[in-house]
């Protein structure tokens, strides 16, 4: 934690030229090698740090790799791995201000999980059975089940988005990224 605060102080000094007296940032290594990228913003509550865009993109790439449709593993194991990556990343960057970014990532992650579930159901009969089990009316389930393999369209624009809701995924074990961040960051 001290190292992260040290780097945030270093970032604020670099951006805002607020250097304390003495050589606080003396380091045997080159500063370019030890630079932690990020930004500091001032809002009504004071100075806030946020993770650099590269760090956010790396987090998204990790989640995308875990949500590949071609990786045929059990959904429980996949959710376990996603939760590990999510907890680790949020615990590392928890003092940062990133509520809106994490909300968007959370929505997209749930869409990717819906696509995976839709693909795992494979045939129309199984898809209809799954939708009926989730409480969708029979005629709607029959129509949506026969849409074909338009995974992203089905996961975002159909009844699947409401049937496989955030609550259903939470029961299955997936932690909400934005909820976990708010819990850990004490916002």
Residue ranges and their predicted role:
Residues 1-187:
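Non-catalytic terminal/accessory segments
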